Amino acid sequence: MRGSYHNHPGYCDGSGTVEEFVAAAQAAGLAAVGVSSHAPVPFTCSWTMTLERFREYVADARVVQERWRGSYPVWVGVELDYLDAELVPDGAAFQRAHVLSVQLDYAVVSLHFVGRDSEGQPWAVDESAESFAQQVDVVYGGNVRRLVEDYYRLMEHLAAWAQGLRIPVVVGHLDKVKQWNVGERYFREAESWYQE
């Protein structure tokens, strides 16, 4: 079904209302729309929902979904981060207890957190260009290949983890790690190690 399912209303770092997303999807001629604000995580993160905001989001989105029932498909989901057990030991238990315990129509499963920053906190690969440069230099000792290989190794783990979620999933931004590689600043994407 031709639709848009990776959308962030203003409950996390996104903007706009669920109703505005529905109207925009209809205007674009899409057959359906899904909303998928960033799910809460068990540590401080500026761009995910808090638990309280998550409950508000689901309730508000269900109201909009009900309003459109029978006339336009609206799916209520989240963008759910893969939280590697070595990085966030309580991540899976937190998600089961607080996010996956809520009835959702689907999830966009994504990888943002790769390793720790210099202060020991989970580090998001897409935080900023400056953060990425610092992570490459400080945490990876200038070895961007190692960071990229860590990212794709974790993507393999994400694929296995997602199969057990018991809701439909869409994999989000498979190649997020190259977001800051504009002009091949860090590596050549044609290199054999990257292509493999």
Predicted regions and their residues:
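Amphipathic repeat-derived elements
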Residues: 2, 62-104, 109-145
